[in-house]
């Protein structure tokens, strides 16, 4: 398996790696330690994680990011050419070059797991930029061309009904490719289920902190509530916007308008305790991120629901359709601070239930991978 993050952790990557191991295969995850701060070799439930260091590389859509990923790709191709695997499992579009190179050189099959629409991220910092739009279009076409060589394509969302918003499966179909949705739902056992508090309450965002506008909306939404109704804001996670978000929230605390707590990166083992602090999960994103409208589903919505915590998400897209169809929370229009505030308040005492878990997704994965696994035998 190949992934361009440090896999420290990447729950989807490790979940699929463990499933491959349970199917009877030895699995090595080739991961890119961009910040060079994790063990270079690690074992997780029998899965080896091999981390590469090719110089410190920033996250984001910069030239240095692109060059760093190219160095990582070349290094992994050399490694796997020297010791060829039976299968290459490509996590996201920026690893497809590796799968295609091994297939061309040694006829090794590869699986493409499209977590996200990677080509949309380069436009995030400047969505009106013609240059970024051009580069994004080139990345998209390159991804589609390479994906056609995959033995199987997996992705992370599909529409919930014939009349709902589209997911990534439908996006692939629109571009002439077939994919199977394996959603990022957690596996039991789960952490402690939410117990509503009659006194104070907390709204949280647990995960990568990249979208400053989402936090600006959250602050505005909370400030539309009466002071005695306002929740504490809890943010946990690192990311490209984490410093700005921390500063913004601490300024509000200093001004006496909000109560907030901010912490940095956390491990997967910390997640249940973090969610246990919350009454409502905030999972809204600026729609200018193309993948939001095209079918992205926030993992934090599923993780929160597994512990009874409802979420507020974007409406007009798949995450809103799924949240409301499964009773996992409320969908609200982007940039309507009053509506977001009222949705948060309405969910304060709600306890939800995640009925479809990662166990269902495991069965879907086995069905989707059946032909590939049969070929390997």
PLM segments and residue spans:
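Glycosyltransferase donor-sugar binding loop
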Residues: 206, 232-245
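Nucleotide-activated donor-binding/catalytic signature segment of Leloir-type glycosyltransferases, i.e.
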Residues: 244-275, 280
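N-terminal subdomain of nucleotide-sugar transferases
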Residues: 1-37, 41-42, 159, 183, ...
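A charged, aromatic-enriched C-terminal amphipathic alpha-helix characteristic of glycosyltransferases
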Residues: 189, 335-339, 348-377
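Nucleotide-sugar-dependent
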Residues: 11, 213, 267-274, 281-302, ...
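Conserved donor-binding/catalytic core segment of Leloir-type glycosyltransferases
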Residues: 154, 186-188, 194-223, 234
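Membrane-proximal helix-turn-helix segments that form the acceptor-binding/catalytic region
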Residues: 74-81, 97, 101-105, 118-119, ...
């Amino acid at each position: 398996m190949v992934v361009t993050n440090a896999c420290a952790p990447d729950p989807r990557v490790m979940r699929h790696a463990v499933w491959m191991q349970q199917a009877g295969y030895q699995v090595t995850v080739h991961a890119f330690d961009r910040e060079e701060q994790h063990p270079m070799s690690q074992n997780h439930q029998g899965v080896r994680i091999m981390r590469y260091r090719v110089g410190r590389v920033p996250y984001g859509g910069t030239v240095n990011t692109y060059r760093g990923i190219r160095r990582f790709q070349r290094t992994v191709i050399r490694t796997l050419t020297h010791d060829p695997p039976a299968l290459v499992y490509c996590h996201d579009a920026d690893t497809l070059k590796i799968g295609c190179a091994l297939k061309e050189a040694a006829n090794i099959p590869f699986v493409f797991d499209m977590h996200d629409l990677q080509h949309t991220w380069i436009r995030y910092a400047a969505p009106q930029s013609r240059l970024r739009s051009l580069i994004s279009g080139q990345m998209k076409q390159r991804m589609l061309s390479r994906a056609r060589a995959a033995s199987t394509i997996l992705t992370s969302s599909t529409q919930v009904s014939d009349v709902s918003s589209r997911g990534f499966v439908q996006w692939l179909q629109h571009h002439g490719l077939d994919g199977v949705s394996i959603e990022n739902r957690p596996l039991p056992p789960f952490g402690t289920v939410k117990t509503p508090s009659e006194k104070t309450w907390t709204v949280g965002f647990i995960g990568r902190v990249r979208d400053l506008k989402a936090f600006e909306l959250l602050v505005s939404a909370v400030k539309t509530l009466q002071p005695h109704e306002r929740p504490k804001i809890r943010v946990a996670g690192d990311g490209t916007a984490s410093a700005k978000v921390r500063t913004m929230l601490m300024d509000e605390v200093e001004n006496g308008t909000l109560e907030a707590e901010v912490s940095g990166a956390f491990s997967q083992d910390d997640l249940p305790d973090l969610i246990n602090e919350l009454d409502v999960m905030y999972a809204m994103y600026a729609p200018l991120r193309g993948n939001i409208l095209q079918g992205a589903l926030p993992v934090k919505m599923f993780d929160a629901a597994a512990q009874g915590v409802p979420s507020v998400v974007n409406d007009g897209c798949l995450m809103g359709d799924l949240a409301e169809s499964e009773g996992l929370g409320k969908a609200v229009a982007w940039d309507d601070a009053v509506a977001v505030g009222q949705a948060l308040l309405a969910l304060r005492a709600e306890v939800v239930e995640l009925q479809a878990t990662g166990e269902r997704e495991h069965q879907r994965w086995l069905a989707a991978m059946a032909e590939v696994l049969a070929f390997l035998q």
